[in-house]
Amino acid sequence: MNEEQENEILAISSIYPDSFSEIETIVGEEENDGFEDNDSQYSKIYQVIITPNISCLDENSLEDNNNSNNNNNNNNNNNNNGLIIDTSYDYLIYFKFKYTKEYPSNEPPIISIKATWLQKSDQSILLSHLEDLWNQNELVIFQMISWLQEESIEILNNHYKSIKKFSHYHLKKSLNTQQLNQNQNQFENQNQNQNQNQNQNQNKEKEKEKVPTIYTGQSVTEKKSKFQAHLAIVHSEREVQLVLNQLLSFKKIYEATHNMYAYRFQLENGEINEYYNDDGEDGAGDKMLFTLSKNQAKEILIVCTRWFGGILLGGRRYVHIVNTTKDILNLYNTNSLSQCSLEFN
């Protein structure tokens, strides 16, 4: 441990005397926390127990034992669009960190977040924001603890609100499309003089939707974090959803830390329909969509999958996200998609 690290530990232990602790573990026993150390038999891990600020949540977002099982609470949950926390149970955040040899000069610390109420996707969102806090040659542990204490709940709350709004929008679009298809089928059936078996066969063919071909590019790995881009040629939001569903049907993709995506396609009236989703990797989707727009893509969906390796990359992760997006888009532009893998079709 270098002098800067020692001074930071002294400061953290002084600021948080009741919640700071030092844990000495045998190498191999801490793998579930994402920590590894091949240089010594024992590894020092530090933990700070954080009570997050939940003042940003409204009454419908807070549960307790008195109302968690009644019908009124169920109605409140249905009307709530954000994060829900049961305050009658432990909602603490257990923040663990460990120093790398070159922290803070060239490397960030290794960190992990655990809480009984946090889902895996929640952890990914928080870790993504913590990555943004680290700057070369700057101590960052106190800043990370403060951010988790003051900002983490609000970030998750806003994330859940945006996800539910997006899901409602696509559900509404899907229902409208289904209704139009049903009306069209009824009209066609009334005007067709074919027999019943022919009509049934035609309806089955219409119900059978073909998923656009998914092309997967080469993966890039840095400090155990892996990035891989997937491309599909799409012409509608329905095709976008079919591709996303297909990718997420694979366990490998479903269990990834992030699956951010962006798409652009041209409508019949000539307008461009475009959208992006960060999937917890704040700012990633916007950069992907900018890349599509800059290349004037008009029928493209790109999904970038990231498997977090346990070591913060800071801004480097955006370099890999953008580069994998550019690489697979370049294969499309040069008619070289045959070089891609088709493993997720």
Swiss-Prot record:
SUPFAM superfamilies: Ribosomal protein S5 domain 2-like, UBC-like. One of its GO terms (molecular function) is protein sequestering activity. GO terms for cellular component: cytoplasm. The keyword Oxidoreductase does not apply. It is found in: Cytoplasm. Keywords: Cytoplasm, Repressor, Stress response, Translation regulation. Residues 191-211 are annotated as: Disordered. Belongs to the IMPACT family. This is Protein IMPACT homolog. It comes from Dictyostelium discoideum. The lineage of its organism: Eukaryota, Amoebozoa, Evosea, Eumycetozoa, Dictyostelia. The gene is impact.
